[in-house]
A protein has these predicted regions:
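Conserved catalytic neighborhood of penicillin-recognizing serine enzymes
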Residues: 249-276, 331-334, 399-405, 522-583, ...
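Glycine-rich, acidic and aromatic/proline-enriched surface loops and short helix-turn segments
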Residues: 264, 268, 272, 306-310, ...
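Juxtamembrane regions of bacterial inner-membrane/periplasmic proteins
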Residues: 46-458, 479-481, 532, 561, ...
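A penicillin-recognizing enzyme superfamily signal
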Residues: 435-460, 470-474, 483, 489-495, ...
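Flexible glycine/proline-enriched surface loops and loop-helix/loop-strand junctions
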Residues: 104, 203-208, 283-288, 321-328, ...
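Short, well-structured active-site flanking segments
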Residues: 233-243, 318-321, 381-385, 491-494, ...
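Short, positively charged and aromatic/hydrophobic N-terminal segments
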Residues: 28-31, 38, 45-46
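Active-site loop and adjoining helix of the penicillin-binding protein/serine DD-peptidase-beta-lactamase fold
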Residues: 209-215, 288, 292, 348-366, ...
Length: 811
C-alpha cells in the first residue's frame, strides 16, 4: 500500500493517537511519523484505543452520562417552551379576528314602501335563491304578489333571531302583510339578515369567519378526513409510516412530501414558518404530539377548519371554511351541499392551483377525487356519488374588490370608529359593527353619478376626466345611507366625499337668508332686497365688487326670489347688513366645524368644504332646525354577540322652527322657479323638493344640495386638478341629483306648519298684502305678526276672478 506523505498509518499507535486527538480536541495527541508501521487492521486500532489511558480519562462513562443528561435537559426545556406556545395559543385568543361590518338589515312591516321587484333584488344581494326547498334558510319562492321566504338566523343588536319562514303579501308598491308561517300569526316586524360589506383586517390581512364544529356540515368533515387524514381519530398527532416517508424525501433533497396528519398541518400553519427542513419537521412532530396531549379531536378539528387557507381576494387572505363558503358560494356554511363541501375540501391541497374560478376543470377533477375517496370509505352511497359528481361547480362571481364594494362609506365608518376604539381592537377583537349603509341607495348613487358624468362628457366633446362625489342621508335621523367618493366607486383611494375641500359657492347663501329670517321684524320672504351695484371696502385688501352670474343688476327683488335666482349682489348686501360675524356664527350652529375666513367674500361661498361637511350643514336645515350629527354606525357587538356600544341619536335644537320653515319654503322656490327648475325633467313638481345650486368662480366647481321628505343628498362635480369644468350647479351636479332621486322615488316634502307661522297672500311686485284672486298674488309663510299690514291695489285677472267666484259660491 502506498503511503501518503505525512499521513498516519491505519492500525498504528499514531493512527489511534490522531483519532483520539480528533475526538478529544487535544492537539497533544497528534502523531505524524511518515515511517510509522502500517498494515494493522481495525482490531489493532480498537486494541490501541483501549490501551490508551488518556482516552479513558477523556471519555469515561460518567462524562457520557453527563452529556446525555445535558441533551435531555435541553430537549425537556425545548419541549416545555413548545408546550407553553401551544397552550398559550390554544387557551388564549387563537385568532386575530377582523371587525365585521354590515349594512342596514331590511326590516319588513305592513305599509313598507317596497315593490316585489325591489325585494327580489334585495334577496339576490343577500344570496337567497329559488326554489323553496322545505325549511332550508336562504331560500324563497314567489307566487304573484306573494312571497315565501326562509330567513336566515342572525344575531342582531337586540338579540338573536332564529331562522323564520315568512309569508309576505304586496298590494301595489307597498307591503301589506307579514306572517310567520311556523307560528301562523301576523308579525309587526321581521328582519332579513344584513349584507356583509367589509372588514377591518389584522396587519397580515387574514380574514376569517369563525364557526363552531357543530355548525360545519358533517359531509364536509367526512370529506376532509377521507382525503387528508383517514386515521385522524386513531393517531396521537403523527402517522409513523407517513412521517418516515416524509423524512426520507427531505433527506434525499426532494422536500417534505406527504405524511402530515391534520394535527401536523394545523401546527405547521398555526406556529411554524414554511421552510422545509428536518429541524422544522422535528419541531412540527413534537408540537403535534403536545397538541394531541392537551386537546381533544373535536377542538383540534374545529381549530383546523377555522385556520386553513382557502384562497385570496385581492390583498385579503381567505381563511377557514366559514368565510370560504361565503366567498365561493355566497351563503352560510350550514347551507353547503355535498358537492360544494367536497370542492372546498379539495382546495385545501392548493387553493390557487384548484381555484374554481380560474381553473374550473382542475377544481372539478379534484372535487370528484374527494367524492371518490368518500365513497371508498363507504361515506357515500353510489347514487349519492353519481349525483354529486354530476353537479355543477355553482361558484358565484368573484367580488370586484379585495376588501369591500363600498370603500368610501367604510372610510367614513373607520373614522367614526377610531374616535371610540383602538386600532388594535378593531383589527383583532372580532367586533360586529352594524352600519347605516342602505345598499339600494348606495347603488343608485353610484349609478347616477357614473351615468350623468358620461352623458355630460358625450354632450361636450373633448371633455373627459370629470369627477364627482355624493353623500345621501336620512332626513329624520342623520343616518348616512350612501357615500360615493369618486366616479370609480370601488377605487380605494382618494375619498372626495370626505377629503375634497372645494369652494362651495352659493351653497352657503342659505345661511345668510336664515340669519335674516331670524329677525322677522326686519326681514320676511316678501321683503324687497337691493340688487344694485355694491362696492365693499376693507382696510388692507382691494375693494370687493360682487357681480351676478348673468352680469346684470335686478333692482328691488323679493327676498325669496333673490335666493331662488341666487343673486350675488342682493345676497352679499343682505349679509353685510346683518353682519359677517352673525352669518358665520350661524354657519357653525348649522354644523360647519371648520373655521371660516371672516371676509365678505365668504358670504358668497369663498369657503372650502368637503361634501360631507356641506351635508351636515343642510341636514340641520332639512330636519327643521335640529342639529343631528351625521352617523354611519348604529350598533357595535362583541364577537360573541354582546352589546358594546350603541350609537344613539343625538339631537339638539339650534334654531327655532319658524325661520327654518321659512327658509325651506324659499329653497322649494329654488326648485319650482329658480336655478334648480331643471329638476322638473326628473321629478314631478308636486313633490315640492327643496334645494340649492352652487357654482364657483370660472365654473370650477358644480354643486347641488337638496332634500325631499325622506332623504337629503349633496353632489359635487369638478376636476381634481381644480381646472375649470365649465359647469354650473344646474348643468353638472343637479342632473346627478335628479337622476339619483328619480331612482329612489322620494317622498314629498311637506314640513308641518309651526304654531307661530301663518300663511298670507302677498303681491309679488310690491311685497304688500293682496287678495288671493289678484293677479301676481302668492301665498307665503310669515312669522305671526310679521306680515305686511298694508295691501296692494288688486289687479284681478279674469281667470282668478272666475275661480274666486266659484270658490265663494261653494264655501
Amino acid at each position: 500500500m502506498e503511503q501518503l506523505p505525512g499521513a498516519a498509518v491505519e492500525g498504528s499507535d499514531s493512527y489511534s493517537r490522531n483519532l483520539l486527538a480528533r475526538v478529544s480536541g487535544d492537539r497533544r495527541f497528534l502523531y505524524n511519523d511518515a515511517n510509522a508501521t502500517h498494515g494493522a487492521g481495525p482490531f489493532a486500532v480498537l486494541k490501541g484505543l483501549m490501551k490508551l489511558s488518556t482516552l479513558r480519562h477523556y471519555l469515561t462513562w460518567k462524562r457520557l452520562r453527563l452529556i446525555g443528561l445535558a441533551l435531555l435537559l435541553l430537549l425537556a426545556g425545548f419541549t416545555l417552551y413548545l408546550d407553553f406556545r401551544v397552550r398559550d395559543a390554544f387557551e388564549g385568543r387563537r385568532f386575530a379576528l377582523p371587525a365585521r361590518l354590515y349594512a342596514r338589515p331590511l326590516e319588513l312591516f305592513p305599509g313598507l314602501k317596497l315593490t316585489p321587484d325591489a325585494l327580489i333584488q334585495e334577496l339576490a344581494r343577500l344570496g337567497y335563491k329559488e326554489p323553496l326547498t322545505g325549511d332550508e334558510p336562504g331560500r324563497f319562492a314567489r307566487h304573484g304578489n306573494s312571497f315565501e321566504i326562509v330567513a336566515r338566523p342572525f344575531v342582531f343588536w337586540d338579540g338573536a333571531q332564529p331562522a323564520r319562514k315568512l309569508h309576505l303579501d304586496f298590494r301595489g308598491d307597498s307591503l301589506s302583510g307579514v306572517h310567520d308561517l311556523q307560528s301562523d300569526r301576523p308579525l309587526t316586524l321581521a328582519r332579513l339578515d344584513p349584507l356583509y360589506i367589509g372588514g377591518i383586517y389584522p396587519a397580515h390581512n387574514e380574514d376569517r369567519l369563525l364557526v363552531r364544529l357543530e355548525e360545519v356540515p358533517e359531509q364536509l368533515v367526512q370529506a376532509l378526513i377521507a382525503i387528508e387524514d383517514r386515521k385522524f381519530y386513531k393517531h396521537h398527532g403523527i402517522h409513523l409510516r407517513g412521517m418516515a416517508r416524509a423524512t426520507v424525501a427531505t433527506a434525499t433533497g426532494r422536500g417534505v412530501q406527504g405524511g402530515s396528519t391534520l394535527t401536523q398541518q394545523l401546527v405547521k400553519n398555526f406556529f411554524l414558518s414554511p421552510e422545509r427542513t428536518l429541524r422544522r419537521k422535528a419541531t412540527e412532530i413534537l408540537m403535534a404530539l403536545l397538541v394531541e396531549l392537551h386537546y381533544d379531536k373535536r377542538d383540534i378539528l374545529e381549530t383546523y377548519l377555522n385556520e386553513i387557507y382557502l384562497g385570496q381576494d385581492g390583498n385579503r387572505a381567505i381563511h377557514g371554511v366559514g368565510l370560504a363558503s361565503q366567498f365561493y358560494f355566497g351563503k352560510p356554511l350550514k347551507e353547503l351541499t355535498l358537492p360544494e363541501s367536497a370542492l372546498l375540501v379539495g382546495m385545501v391541497k392548493g387553493p390557487g392551483y384548484y381555484d374554481p374560478r380560474r381553473h374550473p376543470e382542475r377544481a372539478r377533477e379534484r372535487r370528484d377525487l374527494v367524492l371518490a375517496e368518500m365513497a371508498k370509505l363507504e361515506m357515500l352511497l353510489p347514487a349519492q356519488l353519481a349525483a354529486a359528481r354530476s353537479a355543477p361547480l355553482d361558484v358565484i362571481e368573484k367580488p370586484s374588490m379585495g376588501t369591500t364594494p363600498y370603500p368610501a362609506f367604510l372610510d367614513l365608518v373607520r373614522r367614526q370608529l377610531r374616535r371610540d376604539y383602538h386600532e388594535d381592537d378593531l383589527r383583532s377583537e372580532g367586533l360586529h359593527i352594524f352600519t347605516t349603509l342602505d345598499p339600494v341607495v348606495q347603488t343608485s348613487a353610484e349609478q347616477a353619478l357614473t351615468k350623468r358624468l358620461a352623458q355630460i362628457e358625450r354632450a361636450r366633446k373633448g371633455v373627459t376626466g370629470l369627477e364627482g362625489a355624493v353623500v345621501v342621508t336620512n332626513v329624520q335621523n342623520g343616518e348616512v345611507q350612501a357615500v360615493v367618493g369618486g366616479r370609480d366607486a370601488h377605487f380605494e383611494g382618494f375619498n372626495r366625499a370626505l377629503d375634497a375641500h372645494r369652494p362651495v359657492g352659493s351653497l352657503l347663501k342659505p345661511v345668510t337668508y336664515l340669519s335674516a329670517l331670524m329677525h322677522p321684524e326686519r326681514y320676511t320672504l316678501a321683503t324687497l332686497l337691493d340688487d344694485s351695484p355694491l362696492v365693499w371696502k376693507e382696510r388692507g385688501i382691494p375693494d370687493w365688487q360682487p357681480e351676478n352670474y348673468d352680469k346684470t343688476f335686478h333692482g328691488q327683488v323679493p327676498l325669496r326670489l333673490a335666493l331662488a335666482h341666487s343673486y350675488n349682489v342682493a345676497s352679499a348686501r343682505l349679509g353685510l347688513e346683518l353682519g359677517l360675524n352673525e352669518v358665520l356664527d350661524n354657519a357653525r350652529r348649522l354644523g360647519v366645524e371648520r373655521e371660516l375666513p371672516p371676509y365678505a367674500a365668504s358670504l358668497l361661498g369663498a369657503v372650502e368644504l368637503a361634501p360631507l361637511e356641506v351635508t351636515q350643514m343642510y341636514q340641520t336645515i332639512a330636519s327643521g332646525g335640529f342639529r343631528v350629527p351625521l352617523r354611519a354606525i348604529r350598533e357595535v357587538l362583541t364577537a360573541a354577540g354582546q352589546p358594546v356600544q350603541r350609537y344613539t341619536l343625538a339631537v339638539e335644537q339650534v334654531f327655532e322652527a319658524a325661520p327654518v320653515y321659512l327658509l325651506t319654503s324659499a329653497l322649494q322656490d329654488v326648485v319650482s322657479e329658480g336655478t334648480a327648475v331643471g329638476l322638473k325633467e326628473f321629478l314631478p313638481p308636486p313633490l315640492k323638493l327643496a334645494g340649492k345650486t352652487g357654482t364657483t368662480d370660472e365654473l370650477r366647481d358644480s354643486w347641488f344640495a337638496g332634500f325631499s321628505g325622506d332623504r337629503l343628498a349633496v353632489v359635487w362635480v369638478g376636476y381634481d386638478d381644480n381646472r375649470p369644468a365649465g359647469l354650473t350647479g344646474a348643468s353638472g351636479a343637479l342632473p346627478v341629483w335628479g337622476e339619483l332621486m328619480r331612482m329612489l322615488d322620494p317622498e314629498p316634502l311637506a314640513p308641518p306648519l309651526p304654531e307661530d307661522v301663518e300663511r298670507v297672500w302677498i303681491d309679488t311686485a310690491s311685497g304688500l298684502r293682496a287678495d288671493r284672486d289678484c293677479a301676481g298674488a302668492i301665498e307665503l309663510p310669515f312669522v305671526r305678526g310679521s306680515a305686511p299690514e298694508e295691501s296692494a291695489p288688486c289687479a284681478s285677472s279674469p281667470v282668478k276672478k272666475l275661480k274666486g267666484w266659484f270658490r265663494r259660491l261653494f264655501e
